[in-house]
A protein has these predicted regions:
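Periplasmic plug
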Residues: 65-105
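Bacterial signal peptide processing site
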Residues: 18-20
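C-terminal motif of bacterial Sec signal peptides marking the signal peptidase cleavage site
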Residues: 13-16
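Short, polar/charged loop or turn motifs at beta-strand boundaries
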Residues: 27-46, 76-85, 124
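Extracytoplasmic
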Residues: 27, 40, 68-72, 94-96, ...
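Post-signal-peptide N-terminal segment of Sec-exported extracytoplasmic proteins
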Residues: 34-66
Length: 127
């Protein structure tokens, strides 16, 4: 019995000493939040993404899942296809509340097989 009590004490002590971080404060690398957009101070959403998550903008090579015409992520505004990456230069950062990035496989599952190189989804403030 003393060994069992000692084990319980050790487990309780070790978990009490661990720093617990609330899930909400853990940064999601696939999301740029409204606070991040506002705090960045950039004029366009392209500038925000280029500064905070430049990997969203990189060339991904031929899309193996789609037979490949598209080699970069496609931009969606809310739930509709909006255009190529260059359209991000025309979107004011202040009009966007969140940016979500979907990798190729995640984009195919959510948006369809034409999006094998990923999707950058902009969530507008008016959505």
């Amino acid at each position: 019995m003393p060994a069992r009590s000692w084990l319980l004490f050790t487990v309780l002590l070790s978990t009490a000493c661990v720093r617990h971080t609330p899930l909400a404060s853990v940064e999601n690398p696939n999301v740029i939040t409204e606070d991040e957009i506002r705090d960045n101070g950039a004029g366009t959403i392209y500038e925000v993404i280029a500064q905070l998550r430049p990997e969203y903008l990189r060339d991904r090579g031929p899309a193996a899942l789609t037979g490949g015409a598209r080699d970069v992520a496609i931009v969606f505004l809310n739930t509709q296809e909006y255009g190529p990456l260059s359209i991000l230069n025309q979107v004011a950062a202040s009009d966007i509340s969140e940016v979500r990035y979907y990798s190729g496989i995640d984009a195919v599952i959510k948006f369809g097989r034409a999006y094998g190189n990923g999707v950058i989804q902009l969530i507008s403030r008016t959505h």
